[in-house]
């Protein structure tokens, strides 16, 4: 088994996650990302943002959520930035993506990584 990486839950992520997920579901998300930080699909042109599908209990096939997080490479934490229920939107809006890309670029600079 590989080493787990650190996972950071941002305030924006937590505010939304506590409204749409149970504590157990939130904990499971952290566990999955810690074990497999590269599991999400990289969003093109997003400075490394990833999107991961999440199942939410008792909500049926279309009742899941989408997690948006940043992961650069080994030695860096994964940062959970945003989550939204599938019934709210299929994807991020252009404005949301732009804001999250700005956050990812700040994280890259802050952690000393290269784009």
What positions do the PLM features span?
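Preference for short coil/turn "hinge" residues that link or interrupt alpha-helices
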Residues: 1, 14, 35-37, 85, ...
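Arg/Lys-rich, positively charged N-terminal/basic patches that mediate binding to nucleic acids
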Residues: 1-24
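Enriched for short, Lys/Arg-rich terminal
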Residues: 3, 71-115
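A generic structural signal for short beta-strands and their flanking turns/coil linkers
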Residues: 9, 29, 46-50
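Compact soluble domain cores
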Residues: 12, 21-41
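Residues that form generic nucleotide/phosphate-binding pockets
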Residues: 16, 32, 103, 107
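Amphipathic alpha-helical transducer elements in NTP-driven molecular machines
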Residues: 23-26, 62, 97
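Basic/aromatic recognition patch in beta-strand/loop cores that engages polyanionic ligands
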Residues: 39-83, 88
């Amino acid at each position: 088994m590989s080493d787990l990486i650190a996972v950071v839950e941002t305030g924006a992520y937590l505010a939304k996650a506590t409204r749409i997920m149970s504590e157990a579901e939130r904990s499971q998300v952290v566990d999955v990302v810690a074990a497999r930080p590269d599991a999400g699909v990289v969003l093109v042109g997003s400075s490394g943002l990833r999107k991961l599908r999440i199942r939410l209990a008792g909500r049926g096939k279309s009742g899941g959520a989408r997690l948006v997080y940043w992961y650069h490479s080994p030695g860096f934490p994964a940062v959970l930035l945003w989550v939204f229920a599938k019934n709210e939107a299929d994807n991020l809006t252009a404005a949301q993506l732009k804001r999250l890309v700005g956050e990812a670029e700040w994280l890259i600079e802050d952690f000393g990584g290269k784009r």
